[in-house]
């Protein structure tokens, strides 16, 4: 059985996994796809969904997933250029001859196993790691030469533990300190936080916030300086579904505004939802770099649930399917004239 604790003084909901998933306001992508397609019994696994997906695949014939591309004008500026970059920890190479460019408007998912070099690459981009070979330019400059205001106005990094960036004793003090450090107008960070997390109270100690709230506060602190490049290290670790959905919206808005974004993540569903490009690292080397669909579908390890259900066609998310054939699905579920309507 599954017990759902909805919060807001609402009663518990107890039932079998299928009963709970059919009614739950949030659910894994494979369940959302089953609900959208009207499958019964509702599949709870990719294997069961593939068995039920034949009619849905037929409906998708002749349709193509939405193109994930950046605005040509936004993508003209190179925010990061790495050329044959090598980074070592002692004698051990952490990055080996890495070459890549990140432009404004891109959302790049940096993926790979633990120890592949993802966090090391983010650290090199902000100047925390010296190169043992090759070069890296952030905003056209060697990031290790950037200090203080020059650094925060060029690039922002949200680490795996966002709380590490938060030092004040209240949220309000944190916002004031961020305004001061960024040289921003008074109230800038607080205004950003209201947009990102309107339920956060200014008198709260940052350590008393949830992990999701700490992440959004850290994001507001970094965005106060308006850096064109934003880096996030495992941003969905510990987040619940609603906060993760909010983060996806925020990242899309930032990309549309021209920010370049790189996410180091194991979250294939996040990459499927928001990334325009995926870079895969293995033992410090880039082994794949291309559009999200091309990269994640070619590897079972990185394929999201919807891609596994609808393979070999390049559908990545439930929202992709809905945007293509949503009206057809609604008509197919509509009652006929002979059906009883409740």
Residue ranges, per PLM feature:
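Helix-to-loop junction immediately C-terminal to a conserved catalytic motif
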Residues: 126
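Conserved ABC transporter NBD signature motif
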Residues: 134-142, 151
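H-loop/switch region of ABC-family ATPase nucleotide-binding domains
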Residues: 265-266
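A short, surface-exposed alpha-helical micro-motif characterized by mixed small hydrophobic
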Residues: 271-273
């Amino acid at each position: 059985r599954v017990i759902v604790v909805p919060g807001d003084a609402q009663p518990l909901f107890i039932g079998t996994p299928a009963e709970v998933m059919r009614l739950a306001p949030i659910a894994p992508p494979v369940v959302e796809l089953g609900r959208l397609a009207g499958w019964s019994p509702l599949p709870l696994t990719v294997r069961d969904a593939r068995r039920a997906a034949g009619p849905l695949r037929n409906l998708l014939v002749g349709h193509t997933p939405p193109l994930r591309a950046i605005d040509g004008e936004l993508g003209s500026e190179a925010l990061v250029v790495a050329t044959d970059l090598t980074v070592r920890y002692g004698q051990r190479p952490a990055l080996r001859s890495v070459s890549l460019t990140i432009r404004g408007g891109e959302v790049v998912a940096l993926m790979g196993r633990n120890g592949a070099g993802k966090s090391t690459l983010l650290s090199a981009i902000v100047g925390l790691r010296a190169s043992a070979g090759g070069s890296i330019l952030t905003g056209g400059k060697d990031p290790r030469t950037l200090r203080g205001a020059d650094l925060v106005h060029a690039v922002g990094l949200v680490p795996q533990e966002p709380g590490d960036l938060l030092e004040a004793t209240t949220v309000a003090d944190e916002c004031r300190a961020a305004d001061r450090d960024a040289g921003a107008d008074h109230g800038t960070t607080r205004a950003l936080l209201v947009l990102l997390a309107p339920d956060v109270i200014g008198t709260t100690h940052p350590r008393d916030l949830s992990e999701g709230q700490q992440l959004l506060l850290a994001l507001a602190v970094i965005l106060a300086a308006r850096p064109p490049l934003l880096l996030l290290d495992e941003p969905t670790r510990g987040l619940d579904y609603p906060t993760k959905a909010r983060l996806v919206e925020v990242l899309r808005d930032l990309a549309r505004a021209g920010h370049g974004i790189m996410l180091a993540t194991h979250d294939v569903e996040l990459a499927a939802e928001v990334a325009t490009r995926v870079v895969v690292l293995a033992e410090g080397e880039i082994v794949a770099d291309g559009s999200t669909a091309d990269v994640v579908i070619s590897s079972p390890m990185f394929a999201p649930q919807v891609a596994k259900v609808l393979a070999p066609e390049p559908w990545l998310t439930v929202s992709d399917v809905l945007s293509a054939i949503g009206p057809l699905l609604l008509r197919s579920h509509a009652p006929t004239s002979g059906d009883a309507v409740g």
